[in-house]
């Protein structure tokens, strides 16, 4: 009998598996609204000018490619901290934030999960309903039981505020609560500042451990605005975790540039926490890759490149907003009986469209339009050339 004879075929990843199916589709007019990637008006993944300039400078400098420290590039880690907590953060001045480079936002989440398993081995993890599909898998892989807290209200196309607070309050004390800091994936429906304050009150009262995931900073209302939840928590006195990613905001998907930040109570505590996180990193991948983080670091720490990047990110954010509004208009123009105005109020790269799994399947089989079975569509994949095709098809499957 073969060593692998009992190995079962794993189910396809709901998003990356969709991409595989899309690539295998030979129809010329196919459209991919599934994977979370920003495309420009020409339907291509852009190479940002700020990134090009940073890469050019790095190539011309003939920088060596030796091993990085376990925690990554120091200037990168510091740039991440300032982006999240602000240049004048009291936490940073007090040495109360530990940041390590990570292999994408996914890697940051897994590092945090593995470290938390050592700290709180019997804790429960709570994620929003719905949430990014990999949240559950990552924390279950670390050995945690994972449950949902209510978040999205389909009737109002908004946040189920009462259900959210009730469920957070009902969790066992010292639970780990994963929260989308901005641009909620998959719904595009965010908490407002007053909501965050109420959530924070419950977390403090119950002794929960917040784990903020921020993969889309700058795609909601702006770089500073999208960090509002992180900065509110920074003022709370709580210790908490933040996973962040630059895949989207720098259009560096294949470089896997992320970071894990942990807020502690003191500089001494930070040193001890960092030593343990480094142990987790060492047993996972030893140390992180150089190129992507060096590019991001160069941009964040150069006033000229930082300004150019913020301009380019603003242009991407504006294009997504324009596509949202145009989608709402065209759906109505093509005869949709349903009110889709909520799409225009959502933030970030995604929209929870309200389409059923059967309707999504019809979009794929009849029109070659791929979306996630939950009805999540990537608004960043819309453009003026494909919008009419997409909206007409949606109206036909309603």
UniProtKB/Swiss-Prot annotation:
The modification N6-(pyridoxal phosphate)lysine is found at residue 248. The keyword Chaperone does not apply. One of its GO terms (cellular component) is cytosol. InterPro entries: Aminotransferase_I/II_large, Asp_trans, NHTrfase_class1_PyrdxlP-BS, PyrdxlP-dep_Trfase, PyrdxlP-dep_Trfase_major, PyrdxlP-dep_Trfase_small. L-aspartate binds at residues 36, 132, 185, 376. The keyword Cytoplasm applies. GO terms for biological process: L-phenylalanine biosynthetic process from chorismate via phenylpyruvate. Its main location: cytoplasm. Disulfide bonds: none annotated. Its cofactor is pyridoxal 5'-phosphate. GO terms for molecular function: identical protein binding; L-aspartate:2-oxoglutarate aminotransferase activity; L-tyrosine-2-oxoglutarate transaminase activity; pyridoxal phosphate binding. SUPFAM superfamilies: PLP-dependent transferases. Keywords: Aminotransferase, Cytoplasm, Pyridoxal phosphate, Transferase. It catalyses: L-aspartate + 2-oxoglutarate = oxaloacetate + L-glutamate. Pfam families: Aminotran_1_2 (PF00155). It is an enzyme of class 2 (transferase). Its EC number is 2.6.1.1. It is found in: Cytoplasm. Belongs to the class-I pyridoxal-phosphate-dependent aminotransferase family. Homodimer. NCBIfam families: PRK09257.1 (NF006719). This is Aspartate aminotransferase.
């Amino acid at each position: 009998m073969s060593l692998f004879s009992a190995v079962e075929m794993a189910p396809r990843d709901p998003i990356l598996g969709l991409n595989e199916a899309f690539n295998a589709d030979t129809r010329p007019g196919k459209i991919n609204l599934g994977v979370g990637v920003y495309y420009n008006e020409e339907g291509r993944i852009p190479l940002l000018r700020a990134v090009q300039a940073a890469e050019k400078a790095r190539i011309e400098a003939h920088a060596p490619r030796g091993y990085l420290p376990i925690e990554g590039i120091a200037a990168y880690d510091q740039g991440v901290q300032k982006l999240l907590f602000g240049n004048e953060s009291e936490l940073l001045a007090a040495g109360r934030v530990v940041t390590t480079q990570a292999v994408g936002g996914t890697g940051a989440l897994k590092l945090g999960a593995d470290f938390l398993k050592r700290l709180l081995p019997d804790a429960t993890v709570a994620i929003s309903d719905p949430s990014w599909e990999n949240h559950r898998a990552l924390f279950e892989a670390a050995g945690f039981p994972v449950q949902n807290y209510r978040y999205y209200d389909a009737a109002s196309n908004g946040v189920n505020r009462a259900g959210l607070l009730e469920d957070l309050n009902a969790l066992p004390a010292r639970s780990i609560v994963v929260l989308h800091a901005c641009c909620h994936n998959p719904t595009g429906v965010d908490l407002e500042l007053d909501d965050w304050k109420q959530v924070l009150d419950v977390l403090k009262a119950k002794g929960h451990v917040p784990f903020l995931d921020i993969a889309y900073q700058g795609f909601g209302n702006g770089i500073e605005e999208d960090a509002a939840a992180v900065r509110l928590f920074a003022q709370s006195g709580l210790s908490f975790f933040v996973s962040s990613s630059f895949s989207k905001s720098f259009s560096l998907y294949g470089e896997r540039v992320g970071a894990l930040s942990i807020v502690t109570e003191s500089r001494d505590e930070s040193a001890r926490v960092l030593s343990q996180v480094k142990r987790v990193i060492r047993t996972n991948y030893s140390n992180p890759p150089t190129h992507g983080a060096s590019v991001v670091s160069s941009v964040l720490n150069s006033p000229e490149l930082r300004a150019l990047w913020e301009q380019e990110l603003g242009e991407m954010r504006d294009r997504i907003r324009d596509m949202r509004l145009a989608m709402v208009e065209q759906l109505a123009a093509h005869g949709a009986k349903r009110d889709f105005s909520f799409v225009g109020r959502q933030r970030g790269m995604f929209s929870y469209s309200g389409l059923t799994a059967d309707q999504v399947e019809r979009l794929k089989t009849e029109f070659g339009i791929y979306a996630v079975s939950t009805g999540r569509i990537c608004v960043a994949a819309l453009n003026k050339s494909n919008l009419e095709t997409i909206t007409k098809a949606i109206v036909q499957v309603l």
